[in-house]
Amino acid sequence: MHYSITIRGRGGHGSRPDRAHNPIDCFAAVFSKFQSLNCHITRVDGGTAANVIPGELIFCVESGDGEQELVRCLTPICKLYHCSFEIECP
């Protein structure tokens, strides 16, 4: 099954990372976790400028484990990074 997942954080200027919640950092942890699952990340889109922390990152994943397993994995990681997520099944 194909899913599109949006991770939302708090964007900001790269010189003030203390004021942001970087969804790219969160995604790095998600990516690491997904390596142990039946998931294959097929697309990543996040950030538009070198000196800006983005407010969101969108990635696509093929998963045979289903949406509930994705939610189970994403919830604690996103909470740790002060981010939220939304899963779409286009």
Feature locations, PLM:
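Midchain, well-structured core segments that form catalytic/ion-binding scaffolds
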Residues: 1-90
